[in-house]
A protein has these predicted regions:
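Interfacial "cap-and-anchor" motif at the non-cytosolic start of specific transmembrane alpha-helices
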Residues: 1-44
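A cytosolic-side transmembrane-helix exit/cap motif
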Residues: 43-54
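Catalytic-core segments of nucleotide cyclases and related cyclic-nucleotide turnover enzymes
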Residues: 135-142, 146, 150, 157, ...
C-alpha cells in the first residue's frame, strides 16, 4: 500500500509538470513496472499456503549463511499427517500444515527465519536462539497447536528437531543433524500415542 501511495503521488506530480501525455503514459508504465517487480519479489518471498517464508527464499538465504558462523538450525513437521489425510481428507491435511506453519512462525519469527521447504516440512535458522531454550519454544508451538486443534476439531501436533551449526561445518551436515533430532522427537510421539508410523 505504501508503494501504491507513492505511485499515486508520482502521477499527480507528472500531471502538474508534464503537458505531454506521452510523457505521462511512459512514466506511468515505468512506475507500474517497478510496482509489478516489487509485488513479484514479495510474493516470491512468502509461501502462499502458510504465510511463512518460501522454499525459493530459503535457497536464497542459505547462500548467505556464514560458513564459520555459529547459529541454530531447526526442522519441524506435522505429526500423523498421513493419518489426517486418509481419515479426514486432504483439505484437513492442508489445515494441519497451515496450523504447524503459522504456529512455528508466531512463536519463533521474532528470533528466527522460518521457511516451508515442501509438504509439511519447515526449516529455520537463528543466530539468537540458544539450544537450551528450544524445549520451551517447542512446548509453546505445541500449546498453540493445541488451541488450534480445539477450533479445527482434530488434533494437530508437530515434532521439532534442532542442531547447532559450528564454525567450519557444512550447512547440509547441520541440517541433517537437525533432521535426525526431529525424527527422534517424531518416534517419541508415535510411541506415546500408539499411532503407527505410516498411518
Amino acid at each position: 500500500m505504501f508503494l501504491l501511495g507513492i505511485l499515486e503521488f508520482a502521477a499527480i506530480i507528472l500531471q502538474m509538470f508534464a503537458s505531454d501525455f506521452k510523457v505521462i503514459y511512459v512514466a506511468a508504465a515505468f512506475f507500474l513496472e517497478i510496482y509489478y517487480v516489487f509485488m513479484m519479489e514479495v510474493e516470491g518471498r512468502y509461501d502462499q499456503m502458510t504465510g511463512v517464508y518460501s522454499k525459493r527464499f530459503y535457497y536464497s538465504e542459505i547462500e548467505h549463511l556464514p560458513q564459520n558462523g555459529t547459529y541454530l538450525v531447526f526442522m519441524s513437521d506435522a505429526n500423523g499427517l498421513k493419518h489426517i489425510n486418509d481419515k479426514m481428507g486432504h483439505e484437513y491435511g492442508d489445515l494441519a500444515i497451515k496450523s504447524v506453519g503459522r504456529s512455528t512462525w508466531d512463536i519463533l519469527h521474532s528470533k528466527a527465519k522460518v521457511f516451508r521447504i515442501g509438504g509439511d516440512e519447515f526449516v529455520g535458522f537463528s543466530k539468537s536462539l540458544e539450544e537450551k531454550d528450544m524445549p520451551k519454544y517447542i512446548d509453546a508451538i505445541n500449546a498453540r497447536l493445541s488451541e488450534d486443534s480445539k477450533k479445527l476439531g482434530f488434533d494437530v501436533t508437530a515434532s521439532v528437531g534442532y542442531a547447532i551449526h559450528t564454525p567450519g561445518e557444512d550447512f547440509q551436515a547441520t541440517l541433517h543433524r537437525a533432521d535426525e533430532s526431529m525424527y527422534i522427537a517424531k518416534n517419541e510421539y508415535y510411541e506415546r500415542t500408539g499411532i503407527k508410523r505410516r498411518e
